[in-house]
Amino acid sequence: MINIDYIMDLLDWNNSIEKQAEGIKLARNVKSINVFLQPCDKCHNKNVWDNCAKVLCEKADDELSPYLVELLEWLQDLNWPGAFRILDRLKSFQGGSAYNIAFNTCLRLAQALKDDVWESNLCMIGGEL
């Protein structure tokens, strides 16, 4: 079994394309995909987000469904690495009620926080109110 920190180290955008590709290849086999949801620690933060988004975007809808709120939260700022990848993946999500619940939760949160940017970004993918 390969250590998740080793995989995250490979996903760092400061690495060569080859090392990043190896990290993505290894990350595909990680069962607990929550580790790729915008990690924020001393060594692994925005420097791995784009590659984490690549890994997440390859996952099936049923694998992503438990993490829809976190994926929608990634859209708070489209300047964040990986945000456009997540946006495009969510546009193709076929989750029905699970998606609508997560979307409405995040939309209401954005409205409560008066976060017009996030609200606008959420509207790019649409959902039900």
Question: Could you say what each language-model-derived stretch is?
Answer:
Residues 2-6, 15, 33-45, 51, ...:
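Alpha-helical scaffold segments
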Residues 1-25:
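N-terminal "cap/leader" segments of large eukaryotic alpha-helical scaffolds
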Residues 18-29, 49-62, 73-77, 81-93, ...:
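Structural detector for internal amphipathic alpha-helices that build alpha-solenoid repeat scaffolds
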Residues 1-10, 30-41, 61-74, 96-108:
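Amphipathic alpha-helical scaffolding segments comprising HEAT/armadillo-like alpha-solenoid repeats
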